Amino acid sequence: YKNRTEFIRRHVVFDNFAKFPQVQRYLETGVLENYRRQILVDMPVERHTVRVRRSIHVKHDEELYSRISKTRFDPWKDEPVQNAGGLCYLFRRVVNDDSRRYAAVLDVLKRHPRVVIFYNFDYELERLRGLEKDGFSVSEYNGRRHDPVPEGESWVYLVQYTSGAEGWNCTTSDTMVFYSLNYSYRVMEQAEGRIDRLNTPYSKLFYYRLVSNSPIDRAIQDAISRKKVFNERAFIGL
């Protein structure tokens, strides 16, 4: 393109009703994608690390899960479920907010002294905060707290996916626990990368996924294995 004006004239449509210049859509995006592929240079990075992924199977309250599935009723709020998102949230709470899942974390901490734990929901955070009472040094990275990566020989770093799947790095731990799975393969991959850095001293990195045999956990795992995003409405059948 000779100049910015030529590019805008050919590819950009502005919103005529906006109070300031606002792009409404782009034209001939296939041409732009072709230009992008031509100018990008592939720079493969040879990593010295190996990611060891292990699934830890934990049980859940199957009776409560089944009852919610049949009645579509929220036992915590004592009200009917309104939509697919609400029902999936309840399924996940039954599965994730279980003492046996917390016990699985304690087993991992017996083998690994410095652990990053990713979680989704506030009720998971509340349970994981119990690690402090169990004698562990606990720091957090979420929407309310941005504690730095802990220091010392033994610690736990509780990180919420939305806040901390990217934007920080850690080279003092070789272990990550996914207390619950994220819906997105991309987010899970970004989270794993927090400890997989070029300057990490570790050659083996351990990733533990806590999973149950519940239908929703199996469906989320399937979406992640296919590098997709889990779809709540498709899962519920709406």
Question: Which stretches of residues belong to each language-model region?
Answer:
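Conserved helicase ATPase core of P-loop NTP-dependent helicases/translocases
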Residues: 116-118, 125-164
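Conserved beta-strand segments of the P-loop GTPase G domain that flank and frequently precede/overlap
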Residues: 118, 159-160, 178-180, 210-211
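Hydrophobic residues at beta-strand termini and immediately following loops
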Residues: 56-58, 141, 210
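Phosphate- and divalent-cation-binding pockets in alpha/beta enzyme and binding domains
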Residues: 67, 124-128, 187, 219
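A conserved SF2-helicase RecA2
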Residues: 183-238
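Inter-lobe coupling linker of SF2 helicases/translocases
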Residues: 1-114, 224-226
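Signature of the SF2 helicase/ATPase Hel1-core->accessory helical subdomain module
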Residues: 1-13, 181-186, 195-198
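A short beta-strand element within the Helicase C-terminal
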Residues: 168-181, 206-209
